[in-house]
């Protein structure tokens, strides 16, 4: 590993646990990334796409009616306003540009909720790249609007029926494909997890979320927030929000994992607080495992958080106590989803509703003037059928 230019570990987490055949591809990717980061023309093109195609900077909205406590201001970082409907577009444009720079003609991706798949499809359409998206068969069924969007933009969507037919299985299939095609294809990983250098690349291509938030906060309030709150599945929207605040020790960093039907039911997706360290998806990280070390199925009402592991930098921030990780149940997320729609006229993604749910819980407990920023990582159009079915079921 001595030829690596960047540290593949965050404390004890991370690394490059992949078949030998993929090591040259990952080293080539790291090298290209380091060069691109130092290349002004690459940065200028990336910035131009973010501004004039994706619509950055995104708004920082002070909620008018949402806060349950008059002493607490709740701001929303509006990644839901980004082209494509979620924060995913940021880093996908970065990686797609990087792939073109490396001379790759094809993109391979995995997707859970379909948001990363949609973002990948739009970037490939824009930049003239062939696009293949692996998606668990269960997710294909529960996210049909996004499947149609991907196909409409020219992507090939491949349903994965192995294992639990969800995101982790799509990840495995995508990785398998890439190991036989990396000469011509780039694997565009959708979260800040997986083997090095992906967690670092994804963080750097998402960090404008926190950078903009910091600047907007200083303009609006003349100070930094007391806490920034983001949902955590693999952890890319959260690390994008956290990265620029890590050195600002007055700002609490709070990640919210999905507690599903309740932590004690084992039907959750909260490996950071309730998993054990293991090797999965090319990295060493907290993982949902049974007593024999087999990977347990994760569960969440939101397909994008339904992931049995978490990015290595989050594991490290948790271990050193710089960030804290909480959880919110399906029911709490559903309640927050409806509350934001009714109180502010904004329909959040179910993923983002988990962060919102915890922010509301925290706001109720505050006893002094407090400013909270919730990363509203995506919009909820994709979830209206899921929520409608649940609410109708509940009302019967």
From Swiss-Prot:
Highest taxon of the lineage? Bacteria
Keywords (A to Z) from UniProt: Amino-acid biosynthesis, Aromatic amino acid biosynthesis, Lyase, Pyridoxal phosphate, Tryptophan biosynthesis
- List the pathway annotation: Amino-acid biosynthesis; L-tryptophan biosynthesis; L-tryptophan from chorismate: step 5/5
Q: What is its EC number?
A: 4.2.1.20
The PTM N6-(pyridoxal phosphate)lysine maps to 88
Q: Which Pfam families match?
A: PALP (PF00291)
Q: Which GO terms describe its cellular component?
A: cytoplasm
Q: Which cofactor does it need?
A: pyridoxal 5'-phosphate
Which GO MF terms are attached to this record?
tryptophan synthase activity
Catalytic activity reads: (1S,2R)-1-C-(indol-3-yl)glycerol 3-phosphate + L-serine = D-glyceraldehyde 3-phosphate + L-tryptophan + H2O
Q: Which CDD domains match?
A: Trp-synth_B (cd06446)
Q: Which family does it belong to?
A: Belongs to the TrpB family.
* Role description: The beta subunit is responsible for the synthesis of L-tryptophan from indole and L-serine.
NCBIfam families (alphabetical): trpB (TIGR00263)
Subunit structure, per the record? Tetramer of two alpha and two beta chains.
Protein's UniProt name: Tryptophan synthase beta chain
According to its UniProt entry, this protein's organism is: Shewanella sp. (strain MR-7)
